[in-house]
């Protein structure tokens, strides 16, 4: 089955049938459920879909200030690992996509339930990759300094162009959020090397702050990590630049 076949077209753009008599109703039927919704990267995606008018729900192990904020913004969040806690509106595989973080174990009860019932299940990095299609992507990678640098890029973009969006790996003091939504195609993204997530991005501008030995539980050797960064640089779009 093609990834996001019921929601995205081949360019990764939102599929909303133009001949539908009720386009808004159809749009609202696209629900997103997050496993690990309280994570800094996951919550930014959740906020994006809330802004888009989607129904959003999810699970996290621990209630936090961030999950409280997401709930206040409209998400339904629970903290008990139990498929019975999944809201009824998110129990239909025809209308719900499940996004999970690599931190969620393979034997997680809710993840197993979604798999057993035929849901479309994608990693956070996959969803971010799809959402970045059609954008001018400024991706910041590196074993240290990603969040600070991405926030600087987002702030400069905002101040210079008056627009642009960003998915941040921290709560920016300037924006008071980990999500920035603005006009135009420019998108600043924190490109995480953990689990090779950044290889889901095809940037126009790629920034690498550092490539020190890290996440060796994933890569095995420092050389393998450096090779992944080289692959990331190799995915720069034609006419793009690396910094």
Question: Where would I find each of the regions flagged by the language model?
Answer:
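Phosphate-binding loop of NTP-binding sites
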Residues: 14, 24-25, 48, 71, ...
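N-terminal leader/targeting and accessory segments in enzymes
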Residues: 2-123, 127
């Amino acid at each position: 089955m093609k990834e996001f076949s019921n929601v995205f077209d081949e360019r990764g753009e939102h599929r909303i049938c133009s001949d539908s008599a009720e386009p808004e109703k159809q749009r609202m039927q696209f629900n997103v459920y997050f496993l690990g919704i309280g994570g800094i990267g996951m919550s930014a995606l959740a906020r994006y879909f809330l802004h888009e008018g989607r129904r959003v729900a999810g699970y996290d192990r621990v209630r936090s200030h961030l999950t409280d904020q997401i709930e206040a913004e409209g998400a339904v969040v629970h903290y008990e690992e139990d498929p019975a806690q999944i809201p009824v509106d998110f129990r239909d595989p025809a209308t719900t996509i499940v996004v999970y973080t690599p931190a969620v174990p393979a034997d997680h009860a809710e993840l197993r339930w979604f798999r057993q019932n035929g849901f479309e299940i994608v990693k956070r990095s996959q969803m971010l990759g799809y959402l970045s299609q059609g954008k001018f992507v400024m991706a910041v990678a590196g074993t240290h300094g990603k969040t600070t640098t991405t926030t600087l890029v987002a702030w400069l973009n905002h101040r210079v162009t008056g627009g642009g969006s960003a998915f941040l790996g921290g709560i920016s003091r300037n924006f008071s959020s980990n999500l920035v939504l603005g006009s135009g195609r420019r998108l600043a993204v924190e490109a995480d090397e953990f689990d090779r997530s950044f290889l889901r991005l095809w940037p126009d501008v790629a920034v690498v702050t550092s490539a020190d030995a890290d996440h060796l539980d994933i890569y095995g050797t420092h050389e393998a990590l450096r090779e992944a960064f080289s692959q990331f640089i190799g995915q720069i779009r034609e006419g793009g630049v690396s910094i």
